[in-house]
Design a protein with these regions (language model features):
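Structured, helix-rich domain cores that form ligand/interaction pockets
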Residues: 1-308, 312, 331-363
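Helix-turn-helix DNA-binding segment
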Residues: 318-321
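Residue-level detection of the helix-turn-helix DNA-binding "recognition helix"
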Residues: 326-330
Length: 363
């Protein structure tokens, strides 16, 4: 397994048109019905409040969700793949790097599309693209590995990692070897086999089918990125996207640090066990390390193992856990191990600036 290349950028953004009137959004719905490109996903029993979605603009990189209500605000969210929108052709692996010029160009395309979907009153536009609110951005890193890499082993490592406080696992049934996600209401972190995902949707170009690409993605909703990136609500779209792009590595690294509190090699379980047993560490420390190693390997993951370790050894001070992680680091062993059938260790993932710059594609 060899990491060949690291690409980073923004995959998707979501722009929201809010405070629309009922009749304004109805014009757009009528047009999408005429085009045979709208689907209702929710309606109350009186059809007072309903949610719809449309793929009418998907070839140009936009998916729409529409919310229409008699007694609440009406709005449309536009999930935009900037790379596809700007080039006019589907870009399965391109990641967007914002500039002032391409943000203006993107907004120009959006203005044309508002007219096309009849988002207007008396032939006049009802809003300008710069009035849209940025409601989400997906900060993304693609790790391109050599073709002998088993990505399912890497994803398994994430499944065995430390679950951060306030986060919950999200599962895709039958996709455990290809997908990992943890989330709160405002932030999600995903790790998945990008080529597998493209193939499942029959959207993988032939030239990429043998590639091994692990995608790491932090998706932040508005309140999260305003707080974490130090942005103001009045900041324009370029300022927000530029700040997001500049913080891709930091956002991903923050999750990696939480998931993997020790930075040693992920070794096959028997080898990790042997290194601890043969070390010159205190026997009581070795006992606790082996306990944690075993529980992590056989259980749900490092967070569950840590809880059992605290109960078994009557640990109250959380600093003792971090001290134990330092003992793992001394041996260059990670408590999250590979299965016994795997032959080679895997370095703990690290997105240092040096690591990224060395493997960034040449411009």
């Amino acid at each position: 397994m060899k990491l060949k290349q690291v690409r980073l950028g923004i995959h998707t953004i979501e722009l929201y048109a809010r405070k629309l009137k009922y009749h304004q959004i109805q014009k757009t719905i009528d047009h999408l019905v005429d085009q045979g490109s709208i689907q209702q996903i929710y309606s109350d029993s009186y059809s007072i409040d309903r949610h719809l979605k449309s793929t009418y603009l998907v070839a140009r990189g936009i998916r729409m969700r529409l919310h229409q209500s008699h007694n609440k605000s009406n709005g449309i969210s536009f999930a935009v793949n900037p790379s596809t929108l700007l080039t006019g052709a589907y870009q399965p692996l391109a990641l967007y790097q914002p500039t002032k010029e391409n943000v203006v160009e993107m907004q120009s395309h959006l203005a044309d599309m508002f007219e096309e979907i009849h988002l207007s009153d008396h032939e006049m536009p009802i809003l300008a693209p710069d009035e849209l609110s940025l409601s989400r951005m997906d900060l993304t890193v693609d790790l391109w590995f050599s073709k002998d890499t088993d990505l399912s082993s890497l994803i398994r490592i994430f499944r065995k990692s430390m679950l951060p406080r306030h986060y919950k696992h999200r599962e895709l049934e039958g996709k455990q070897d290809y997908f990992f996600e943890l989330a709160t209401k405002e932030i999600s972190f995903k790790v998945y086999d990008k080529i597998y995902e493209l193939e499942q949707n029959d959207r993988c170009p032939k030239k990429y089918r043998k590639e091994r690409i692990l995608r790491l993605e932090v998706s932040m909703r508005r309140e999260a990125f305003l707080e974490k990136l130090g942005l103001k609500r009045k900041d324009d779209l370029f300022a927000m996207l530029k700040m997001g792009y500049d913080n891709v590595c930091a956002a991903i690294s923050e999750f990696l640090d939480k998931l993997f509190p020790a930075g040693g090699m992920h070794l096959p379980y028997p080898e990790a066990e042997r290194k601890i047993q043969q070390s010159k560490l205190d026997s009581a420390i070795k006992e606790q390390m082996l306990f944690l190693l075993k529980k992590t390997s056989r259980g749900a993951g490092l967070d569950t193992a840590a809880q059992k370790w605290k109960e078994t050894y009557s640990v109250v001070d959380i600093r003792k856990f971090h001290a134990l992680m330092k003992q793992f680091d001394k041996l260059q062993v990670n408590p999250v191990t590979l299965t016994s059938r795997e032959q080679q260790g895997i370095p703990c993932l690290c997105l240092s600036n040096e690591n990224v710059s060395k493997r960034a594609p040449k411009k």
